[in-house]
């Protein structure tokens, strides 16, 4: 190779990936390769060290920026305009509200939000954080009503603190949302997913059985992360040697939604662009080579795209959404299930005596933990909650985690009771944006819990657990436990 030639770009599944937080591997941050690849800036290989591969796909990166850049620019504009409008109009409109310093971005709050939720729930129905310029709803009835009022509270400007838009199902309003949801619904319905139950049950047996042979062990890396990764990639049709790359790149790609006006926000944005390009190349390769089987969810959606009912962009974003939603939140549900049963050994005994309570116990665990802690909406017009009026154009945080522990809705909400059967909990959201993967998540959770109840008598935490500091998610990055096998009577 001459000095003027560039080596070929590495295959999509061989690039350096950001660490997988669920598996306990560190995120090593933004490397030079990530930055130059994402921004299209060529680098040179250092002959003495093997060096960093030269970025030779500038046109691809430019195309990625042209495709998603306008949405990011729009998000930045919305963020600035929203802050200005809220400060101007909201300054005189915050009667019947309470100021709060509750900030889900605070690592201390993210690690243990429940004392702060109790403060929110004891206060006014609407609370305002001036630092984040966000209005917070925490009571169950208010959160549920807001989630269902999609005419007044929009998802199209983003559902996180970083206002932005990409053609995701969660960040769309009717009629676009209705059309996309209609395409997805048949593949994620309970009847369609039943065909995957034997695979899910067998996977749960393997993973819990493996835990019994290597105790003590980290349940995040041995059970909680592998279970949803292998299940969702099989259901979607991207299983096999690429499954880990799909999951990790999906989590990297969604960083494009973090358009915070800060250095860390810019780094996340660059990482997101890099992840999107690599993930799309991997996805396109599988689709073009007939590797999306017709019996899978993405295989069916690909057929819809060929028939013109979905655009290529929408098909790709469905893949990203389902991988991220079906992997990370379910992994958090499973990892925290072990912690809950360790903290409540009497409930594990109860389940062993009454295994018919397993479905109810999973619903109670979802209420108790709420893997998705909050989500945001933007008011289209002034929105009234009691006597308080939230101005049009304002960011509103719906605190799922607090609502699911509202004593007005649930007796002794800070206690896990396997026989509670908390009908109507908000762990999966509510209204038209109810999580489309609820049936698969329940199937996985119940399969794991059945294996725990049948084979494990006691769970003991042997090291302090490590919690994610994600502002929107509640889950563990490490949980080392020792398990005592159940002895057959």
From Swiss-Prot:
Descriptive protein name: Beta-dihydromenaquinone-9 omega-hydroxylase
Highest taxon listed in the record's lineage: Bacteria
Keywords: Cytoplasm, Heme, Iron, Metal-binding, Monooxygenase, Oxidoreductase
Cofactor needs: heme
InterPro entries: Cyt_P450, Cyt_P450_B, Cyt_P450_CS, Cyt_P450_sf
Family: Belongs to the cytochrome P450 family.
GO cellular component, one term: cytoplasm
Major enzyme class: oxidoreductase
Enzyme Commission number, as recorded: 1.14.15.27
Record field: catalytic activity: beta-dihydromenaquinone-9 + 2 reduced [2Fe-2S]-[ferredoxin] + O2 + 2 H(+) = omega-hydroxy-beta-dihydromenaquinone-9 + 2 oxidized [2Fe-2S]-[ferredoxin] + H2O
Underlying gene: cyp128
Disruption phenotype: Deletion mutant does not synthesize SMK and shows a hypervirulent phenotype in the mouse model of infection. Loss of the gene does not affect levels of menaquinone-9 (MK-9), an essential component in the electron-transport chain in M.tuberculosis.
Coiled-coil stretches noted in the UniProt entry, renumbered to this chain: none
Main location: cytoplasm
GO MF terms, alphabetically ordered: cholest-4-en-3-one 26-monooxygenase activity; heme binding; iron ion binding; steroid hydroxylase activity
Pfam families for this protein: p450 (PF00067)
Cellular compartments annotated: Cytoplasm
Function noted in UniProt: Involved in the biosynthesis of sulfomenaquinone (SMK, initially named S881 on the basis of its mass), which is localized in the outer envelope of M.tuberculosis and negatively regulates its virulence. Catalyzes the hydroxylation of beta-dihydromenaquinone-9, leading to the formation of omega-hydroxy-beta-dihydromenaquinone-9.
């Amino acid at each position: 190779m001459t000095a003027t030639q560039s080596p070929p770009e590495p295959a999509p599944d061989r690039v350096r990936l950001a660490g997988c937080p669920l598996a306990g591997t560190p995120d090593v941050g933004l490397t030079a390769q990530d930055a130059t690849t994402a921004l299209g800036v060529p680098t040179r290989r250092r002959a003495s060290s093997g060096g960093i591969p030269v970025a030779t796909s500038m046109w691809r990166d430019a195309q990625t920026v042209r495709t998603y850049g306008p949405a990011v620019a729009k998000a930045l504009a919305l963020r600035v305009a929203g802050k200005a409008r809220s400060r101007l109009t909201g300054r005189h409109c915050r009667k019947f509200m309470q100021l709060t310093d509750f900030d889900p971005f605070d690592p201390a709050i993210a690690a243990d939000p429940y004392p702060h939720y109790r403060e929110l729930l004891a206060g006014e129905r609407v609370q305002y954080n001036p630092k984040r310029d966000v209005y917070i709803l925490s009571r169950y009835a208010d959160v549920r009503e807001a989630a269902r009022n999609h005419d007044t509270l929009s998802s199209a400007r983003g559902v996180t603190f970083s206002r932005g838009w990409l053609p995701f199902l969660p960040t769309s309003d009717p009629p676009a949302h209705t059309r996309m949801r209609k395409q997805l619904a048949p593949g994620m319905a309970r009847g369609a997913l039943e065909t995957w139950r034997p695979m899910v049950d067998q996977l749960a047996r393997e993973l819990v059985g493996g835990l019994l042979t290597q105790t003590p062990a980290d349940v995040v890396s041995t059970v909680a992360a592998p279970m949803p990764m292998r299940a969702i990639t099989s259901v979607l049709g991207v299983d096999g040697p690429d499954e880990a790359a799909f999951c990790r790149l999906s989590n990297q790609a969604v960083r494009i939604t973090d358009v915070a006006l800060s250095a860390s926000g810019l780094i996340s944005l660059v990482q997101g662009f890099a992840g999107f390009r690599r993930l799309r190349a991997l996805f396109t390769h599988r689709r073009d080579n007939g590797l999306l089987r017709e019996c899978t969810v993405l295989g069916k959606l690909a057929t819809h795209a060929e028939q013109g009912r979905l655009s290529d962009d929408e098909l790709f974003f469905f893949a990203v959404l389902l991988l991220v939603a079906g992997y990370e939140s379910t992994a958090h549900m499973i990892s925290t299930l072990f912690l809950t049963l360790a903290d409540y050994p009497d409930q594990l005994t109860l389940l062993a005596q009454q295994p018919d309570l397993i479905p109810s116990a999973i619903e109670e665990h979802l209420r108790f933990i709420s893997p998705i802690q909050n989500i945001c909406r933007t008011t289209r017009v002034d929105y009234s909650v009691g006597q308080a009026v939230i101005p049009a154009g304002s960011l509103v945080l719906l605190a799922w985690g607090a609502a699911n522990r509202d004593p007005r809705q649930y007796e002794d909400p800070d206690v896990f009771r396997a026989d509670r059967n908390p009908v109507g909990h908000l762990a999966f959201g509510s209204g038209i944006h109810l999580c489309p993967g609820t049936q698969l998540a329940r199937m996985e959770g119940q399969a794991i819990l059945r294996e725990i109840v049948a084979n494990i008598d006691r769970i003991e935490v042997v090291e302090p657990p490590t919690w994610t500091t994600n502002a929107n998610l509640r889950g563990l990055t490490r949980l080392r436990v020792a398990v005592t096998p159940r002895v057959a009577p």
